[in-house]
Amino acid sequence: MTKPTKYRDVEIRAAHGNKLTAKSWLTEAPLRMLMNNLDPQVAENPKELVVYGGIGRAARNWECYDQIVESLTHLNDDETLLVQSGKPVGVFKTHSNAPRVLIANSNLVPHWASWEHFNELDAKGLAMYGQMTAGSWIYIGSQGIVQGTYETFVEAGRQHYDSNLKGRWVLTAGLGGMGGAQPLAATLAGACSLNIECQQVSIDFRLNSRYVDEQATDLDDALARIAKYTQEGKAISIALLGNAAEILPELVKRGVRPDMVTDQTSAHDPLNGYLPAGWTWDEYRARAKTEPAAVIKAAKQSMAVHVKAMLAFQKQGIPTFDYGNNIRQMAQEEGVENAFDFPGFVPAYIRPLFCRGVGPFRWAALSGDPQDIYKTDAKVKELIPDDAHLHNWLDMARERISFQGLPARICWVGLGQRAKLGLAFNEMVRSGELSAPVVIGRDHLDSGSVASPNRETEAMQDGSDAVSDWPLLNALLNTASGATWVSLHHGGGVGMGFSQHSGMVIVCDGTDEAAERIARVLHNDPATGVMRHADAGYQIAIDCAKEQGLNLPMIK
């Protein structure tokens, strides 16, 4: 048997314009979005099929990628392609309102749901880590998480600093696909930020895409810049090459006091995503292949040091929170018993939004024309006229966010609003106002599509943190409702054994049939989030369910 190819020296970019390369827009859309995930402007390591988040891939290997492209190119509108951990395994006759693609990535029976077992399967070519939007083909670059991070910083500013972050600064680490959103989000929220990153290539990526403003030469230079900009009231983001497990303890030792502390290193994956203190990146990658157990141990020991420093900041009264990378869990496993003393960002700042089905609604212009996104921005403002916060976000996004690959936009909207926007976008395609169809999707990090006790479902008030029926129901309902492609993943964000989550994407191609599917999917999808939180007893969700007329049999 020929060994599967994990590396290919090639550049992939999605087709642009309104000329089809597949049989219809329902199959052209997943084809373009798969390719867009691997665009060198989008992906972290596209030649190895890695999109973001350590080893989050778009396809299992290059042979699988080629066959997915082949299958989508010839897929009919009454057929469905099944993808198992990045490998196309079957094409079946279904019907025109069924999904064109159904994806299951990284799922393991719970007893075996560990990194150790997954890595064995991955080495044998039997599995693929799909992260959240890598293996579900709806990653749009760091913009995909910018607004969620922005909303978090804004809410933290409201709670701790009277809604004013001017002259304040955020300390964090990690400038990968997810963490790369932090510096821009902090700037948009009005704060300075110091962003520690151990790879110069990641810093360069964020500098080139304008997600980070400057790079300091060393820690002293970084602190001098922070002092200058905070005194001047300027919101400037600063990158610093270094290891967080070394720099945070040094900051504690020096008595430096940030105004907010968080982290977005790839701590969820100690073998591939977190550089042990004192190691070079080349050493880390080489030893990961020859002595993985020792590498994992060293990475987790460094995480323990990192978390102890974060706890020290919290003890000083500095707002400190986990941003969903499972670093607290890793530190606790290394003996830091009080690792969970600082909260996760969802229970601390975001859950009230989830209770109303508000979450990361995103869309991409398959035309490749930025004007299509600017026109949809205007439509969002027209249809949601009274939300000044949303309008401000859209204005800032247009000014500051560079498109990566196919032009795309994200904004957090909820139940009722998503369907209204989707139907309007479909009408814009029908009328020719948009030059080609758009796709609408979301992160798996949403109100009803994830079970993750150390992140999205941390500290649920009824204790249902680990109940994972909800993302399964979300995926089933999106399939029944007619989403264009639906995905069900395990381990995204926080790593193997710690999460299950689902995603959906729907195509707006301007047809009546699309409008019917959009109305169902973009209502039902956020409605499951309201349902899930109402079931857990959150009054905000119960009130929203009643206002929106949801039929929840056990909610009176």
UniProtKB/Swiss-Prot annotation:
Tell me the residue numbers annotated for binding NAD(+).
Answer: 53-54, 131, 177-179, 197, 243-244, 264-268, 274-275, 323, 493
A GO BP annotation = L-histidine catabolic process to glutamate and formate
Question: What is its subcellular localisation?
Answer: Cytoplasm
What are the alphabetically sorted keywords of the record? Answer: Cytoplasm, Histidine metabolism, Lyase, NAD
Q: Does the keyword Cytoplasm apply?
A: yes
Spell out the reaction equation it catalyses. 4-imidazolone-5-propanoate = trans-urocanate + H2O
Q: Which residues of this protein are catalytic?
A: 411
Cellular component GO terms held in the UniProt record: cytoplasm
Tell me one GO molecular function of this protein.
urocanate hydratase activity
Write down the HAMAP family for this protein, in alphabetical order. Answer: HutU
Q: What is this protein called?
A: Urocanate hydratase
Species in which this protein is naturally found: Pseudomonas fluorescens (strain SBW25)
